[in-house]
Amino acid sequence: KAVRFIPMFTLEEIEQYTIQNKKNFGTLKEAIYSRKIIDKNHLYSDTILGKKIWDNLLGDTPSKTNIYFSPEGIFHLLGIEYLCFDRPDCKIFRLSSTRRLCEDRGTASKPSLLLLGGLNYNDDSAVIQHPDTLPDRSASEILGRDMLPPVVGQGYTYLNGSLAEVNKIRTLISPNSCQLYQYSKGTEDIVKQDMQKYNMIHISTHGFCFDYQIVPSTLYLKDNVSEDLSLSRCGIILSGANRTAKQDANNKYVEDGILTARELCNLNLTHVELAVLSACQTGLGRITADGIAGLPRGLKKAGANAILVSLWDVNDHATQLLMTQFYRNLLKGKNKIESLHDAQTYVRNYEIEVETGVGKQQWKSRVRQEIDKTKEKSASPQTTKIKKYQDPYYWAAFFLIDAI
């Protein structure tokens, strides 16, 4: 069929779009860059925004159609596939490039999974010295200059939900097909080495991105080191990093425990069918004419196929629920998009029981009432079930790229 051009809006129009909510009025761009939970909830609940983006595109689309899109500009930082619009019958696939549709995707191999989680960032007992070479410590040098953790300050704290997450995922796959690293064992040396051995990678830890502005293409082309610096300001934290990242003479011959997007570029991940970075901000990066310069680009340059990353600081327990259900669906035979969609639905409907208050006081008995009217017995507390994670902040942070 002939290619069809559909005009939508200018960059300024969409960036300055006013988010619909009952109290505060902010723009789309402000909501995307905001770290407030309420702003994420308003953004992804705005039905007018969803229609503005999707209605013209999907108006003449047949039912149950697969939609493939490659984002541009600010849409790299917005999960437009999760916005409210009237075509739930369509499956939407985010691609790093539409040329992926023309590539031979081969056949899926038997799952082999590398799992990392429950890492101890203060324990560097398993870190290996490299006296004959100088390890790559560029990440700690850059973060040190910027006065950022874990080089400066208190460092990163232990994630209880991360340990539960990887332990539950481990039970879903054959022990012979899974390698789990916890506590002090998930060092940068081990991760770089073993990421190149498995076709599925799941890393549950802290993530960071300190550079996710949109750069005009004219400026970006003039700066040859812009991409390299951007890739060095996005990464994940591994075992012992609170100690090994310090600018100390004792750390001269050890990896700094910070795996950046730039370092990922140098690995061979062509065999990796799915890479999951279950951490905060792993889908962010500097936006340029070439796309997003962050962890997604590092993984794609290394050759990884589908990746699952996040747009903001995620909730520990909600992420644990999401990831566990995602793998449960995936290992039952569902495709990646269906597995994530069903996992998000599971999180949205996840219920907990909460106490609503103490019931009215009741007399123990009529006889007792006559004997001592001052003694009372409290009724059992009343409880109700609530959907704790139904807001978009809890389930819409993670998105798949190239899950085809």
Model features per residue range: what roles?
Residues 1-404:
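Catalytic cores of enzymes
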